[in-house]
A protein has these predicted regions:
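Fungal secretory targeting signals
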Residues: 1-20
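Carbohydrate-active catalytic/glycan-binding domains of CAZyme proteins
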Residues: 18-347
Length: 347
């Protein structure tokens, strides 16, 4: 891959002390202490699975929390001001978990309208849905909840392939540069990450009966398939699929094997629908993916929840942002804080 200059913004989880903690020689058995990757810089807001959109010279940050709050800042380092909430009551989607606390939002601006795709689910379950809400401005005005775009393990069209094998969480959005057709990416574990075309109004699938879904990533030879949280970006002439690989959180009962925690990986293709390959030309559909950022310095653990802000012009870098656990404080994922790090050359 050609060299691309990325400015990365990261989100650090601040921990309220809770066992278990590795000590002494146990540290190197749990996470990487290498200093070959840079540490992030402070950004001053709590967030997990952050989502950031730029509009009218400001950054707007959305995060999973009750009623899905969003914040505004003139700079990625803050200070961040609470603007409002996407919801003032539970989602209109029925029979799914977290209806009052949607997960993993992705907000985009399209033709003068803001669309917030959100997740309803419970941890470790396929009984999930991705919904969408809209507004015309990010000034705190009311949003309209349009309900589910896709549902899995129960709900409308959940028996249609591939909804009968996938997990409807972690939505992201991309538009084909040539055709201007818009696509929704989704998926977590089970059969990993998928994509389908959206209707012209971006509120539903283009064809619910025959959704024309394609698989973007897959781990074929292992029982566990820990890929999720995908994001797709375009950097001429390639589309890039970024995703989290490994275990994200809930380490109170123990840690995964070293290197099996979250890391950020990527593949690329000239076609928005793939197939995607990594730096070594391995297919993402065959377990490939170049590691971009992973646990490091004995402080950064399990980075993931990735998103990309495009550069404002050809001379500015794209921004890759994410969260991680700050191991100098602890290992639970109760509170998090965004940070930025310096520029790095990525292949």
């Amino acid at each position: 891959m050609p060299r691309i200059l990325w400015l990365l913004a990261t989100f650090v989880v601040l921990i309220q002390a809770a066992p278990p903690f590795p000590f002494g020689d146990e540290v190197s058995q749990v996470y990487e202490t290498t200093d070959t990757l840079p540490l992030p810089n402070l950004g001053n807001i709590v967030a997990h699975d952050p989502n950031i959109v730029q509009s009218n010279g400001f950054y707007y940050l959305f995060k999973g929390d009750p009623h899905l709050p969003f914040f505004k800042a003139a700079n990625m380092s803050g200070p961040w001001e609470l603007v409002g909430h996407v919801f003032d009551k539970a989602s209109i989607i029925q029979h799914k978990g977290a209806r009052k606390r949607p997960w993993a939002p992705t907000t985009i601006e399209h033709n003068g309208m803001f669309y917030c795709y959100y997740t309803l689910s419970t941890h470790g379950s396929r009984d999930s849905a991705i919904g969408v809400a809209t507004t015309t401005t990010l000034d705190g005005s009311a949003w309209t909840d349009h309900g589910a775009v896709i549902e899995t393990d129960g709900g409308k069209d959940s028996d249609v392939y591939p909804f009968n094998i996938t997990n409807a969480i972690d939505a992201s959005f991309i538009t084909d540069q040539a055709t201007e057709e818009s696509y929704l990416n989704w998926g977590s574990f089970w059969h990993d990450i998928w994509q389908l075309p959206l209707s012209a109004d971006l509120l539903s699938m283009k064809n619910p009966i025959d959704p024309d879904a394609v698989q973007l990533s897959f781990i074929p030879h292992k029982k566990s398939k820990p890929e999720e949280g995908s994001w797709m970006s375009y950097h001429d002439p390639y589309y890039y699929v970024w995703f989290s690989h490994g275990k994200c959180c809930r380490f109170q009962k123990g840690f995964p094997g070293r290197g099996e925690e979250y890391s950020i990986r990527v593949g690329r293709s000239r076609n928005v629908r793939g197939p995607f390959v990594d730096k070594n030309n391995n297919l993402l559909l065959d377990g490939g993916g170049t590691v971009v950022y992973a646990s490091n310095n004995g402080k950064v653990y399990a980075p993931g929840g990735v998103g990309v802000l495009p550069g404002i012009n050809a001379s500015t870098s794209d921004i890759l942002y994410f969260h991680y656990l700050n191991t100098s404080i602890g290992f639970t994922d109760q509170v998090c804080m965004p940070k930025t790090w310096d520029r790095m050359n990525g292949n």
